[in-house]
UniProtKB/Swiss-Prot annotation:
Biased composition, class Basic and acidic residues, residue ranges: 110-120, 127-138
Signal peptide, first to last residue: 1-25
UniProt subcellular location: Secreted
Listed SUPFAM superfamilies: Growth factor receptor domain, Thyroglobulin type-1 domain
Protein name in the entry: Insulin-like growth factor-binding protein 6
Annotated disulfide bonds: C30-C33, C41-C45, C58-C64, C72-C85, C79-C105, C160-C188, C199-C210, C212-C232
GO MF term list: identical protein binding; insulin-like growth factor I binding; insulin-like growth factor II binding
Length: 238
């Protein structure tokens, strides 16, 4: 399942929503290394103080807080206080990495560090704004009509891209009801159509179910062995 070609802004929004759901889900009440949970803590863990009783899914997840540098993800135990689960630097598919537990617990960065690059105006953009300002002074009539970006119309999007935008709009309410488990995010190609293999997100160590679709998202018949193989035929896009 790949995430190539998807716009950065929707993916960042989805990541924030998924971690908001994770913090309020069953994993939030997981205990630390005590209460017989040590056997599930490979590589060591940090004991969480004042932890409540184990919630559903804690035993399966290991019930630990991950240390700095240890792997983490949306459906794995939380990072220790002061750490955040982040994709690796230059990760090509950050959303997928966090969904399958390939993130890393790292020191939380302050707001000033995250916004430093964004706050620095690019030289080309600054010069462009200066040029536009001078042009408006020379031609006052042109300033009456503000320049607006040309949004992509729904009719110009592929069916998978429209589906993805719809999912992002609904996530804000669904994740806070525990709807992040078994989440299905459409797997789109560069043209906005469905890739041949679609999968639900993994839960813990269990991989989510996958199925095959055509470019319009219609499910294709399962393999002749009846096992629902994820080896999709060449008839579908992707």
């Amino acid at each position: 399942m790949t995430w190539d070609g998807l716009p950065t802004q929707p993916l960042l929004m989805l990541l924030m929503l998924l971690f908001a759901a994770g913090s309020g889900s069953a994993l939030a009440g997981c205990p630390g290394c005590g209460a017989g949970m040590q056997t599930g803590c490979r590589g060591g863990c940090v004991e969480e103080e004042d932890a409540g009783s184990p919630a559903d899914g804690c035993t399966e997840a290991g019930g630990c807080l991950r240390r700095e540098g240890q792997p983490c993800g949306v459906y794995s135990p939380k990072c220790a206080p002061g750490l955040q689960c982040q994709p690796r630097e230059n990760e090509e598919a950050p959303l997928r990495a966090l969904l399958i537990g390939q993130g890393r617990c790292q020191r939380a960065r302050g707001p000033s560090e995250e916004t430093t690059k964004e706050s620095k105006p690019q030289g080309g953009a600054s010069r462009s704004r200066d040029t536009n300002h001078r042009d408006r002074q020379k031609n006052p009539r042109t300033s009456a009509a503000p320049i607006r970006p040309n949004p992509v119309q729904d009719s110009e999007m592929g069916p998978c891209r429209r589906h993805l935008d719809s999912v992002l709009q609904q996530l804000q309410t669904e994740v806070f009801r525990g709807g992040a488990r078994g989440l299905y995010v459409p797997n789109c190609d560069l043209r906005g159509f469905y890739r041949k293999q679609q999968c639900r997100s993994s839960q813990g160590n269990r991989r989510g179910p996958c199925w095959c679709v055509d470019p319009m998202g219609q499910p294709l018949p399962v393999s002749p062995d009846g096992q629902g193989s994820t080896q999709c035929s060449a008839r579908s896009s992707g």
